[in-house]
Structure formats: structure tokens, C-alpha cells
Swiss-Prot record:
GO terms for biological process: cellular response to phosphate starvation. InterPro entries: P_starv_induced_PsiE, P_starv_induced_PsiE-like. Keywords: Cell inner membrane, Cell membrane, Membrane, Transmembrane, Transmembrane helix. GO terms for cellular component: plasma membrane. It is found in: Cell inner membrane. Belongs to the PsiE family. Residues 36-54, 103-107 are periplasmic. This is Protein PsiE. The gene is psiE. Residues 1-14, 76-81, 129-136 are cytoplasmic. PANTHER family: PROTEIN PSIE (PTHR37819:SF1).
Length: 136
């Protein structure tokens, strides 16, 4: 098997990075559209007189924050030199589990397990932000 020359490897890397960047840019634009749709949906739910609409409003707010966090993750990717910071994924995980607790809270054992998962993610976030793992 022949080894690839350094310029060829850099060219392939550049092509793949460009494809990744374009894909993330498209994903970011799609998320902005969904964020706009969620804003309109939240406005509709806000003025609905039903009692059930309050739960739908809270769920919609958490989904709104999920869209917002994914968009912030993509922005941070471009700002940090094409690198995804781990803590943003942890934030998204915590928000997603909180949404799950709000939507599906019928089983107390499930809520306890979800809460333990949130605690684990918070500890992970604390460890990632500690000085031992801090990247300069």
C-alpha cells in the first residue's frame, strides 16, 4: 500500500472540512427556521385559554431552548476554530432530559432515573470546567 503524500492528505482534509462546514451551515439555517416556527407556535399557545396549554407552553419553551442551544453550538464551532466544546453537548443533554421529565413524568422511578442522569451530567460539567481539565 502506498502512503499518501503530505499535500494530498492536506487537500483531502481541506475538502472534508469544507463539506462539514457547509453541512453545519445548512443545519444552522434549518434550525433558525424551526426556531422561528417554534416562536409562532409559542405565541399561539400563550394566548390559548385551555389549561392544557400551560403544559404545552412549558414544553415548547424547553424545545425552544434546545433549538437555541444547538444554534449556539454551531456558532461556537465556527468561533473556536472548528471545534465542538464538550460542555455545550452536556448543556443540550441536560435540557433534553429536563424536557423529557416535563413531558413524561408518569413513573416516579423514571423521573428518579432521569434526575440521576442530570446529576451525572452536572458532575461531568463541573469536571470539564475544573482547572485539571481546562484547555488553554
Amino acid at each position: 500500500m502506498t502512503s499518501l503524500s503530505r499535500p494530498r492528505v492536506e487537500f483531502i482534509s481541506t475538502i472534508l472540512q469544507t463539506v462539514l462546514n457547509l453541512g453545519l451551515l445548512c443545519l444552522g439555517l434549518i434550525l433558525v427556521v424551526f426556531l422561528g416556527k417554534e416562536t409562532v407556535h409559542l405565541a399561539d399557545v400563550l394566548f390559548a385559554p385551555e389549561q392544557a396549554s400551560k403544559y404545552e407552553l412549558v414544553e415548547g419553551l424547553v424545545v425552544y431552548f434546545l433549538y437555541f442551544e444547538f444554534i449556539a453550538l454551531i456558532v461556537k464551532y465556527f468561533q473556536s476554530g472548528f471545534h465542538f466544546p464538550l460542555r455545550y453537548f452536556v448543556y443540550i443533554g441536560i435540557t433534553a432530559i429536563v424536557r423529557l421529565i416535563i413531558v413524561d413524568h408518569k413513573s416516579p422511578l423514571d423521573v428518579l432515573i432521569y434526575s440521576a442522569a442530570i446529576l451525572l451530567l452536572v458532575v461531568t460539567l463541573w469536571l470539564c470546567n475544573s482547572k485539571r481539565l481546562k484547555r488553554e
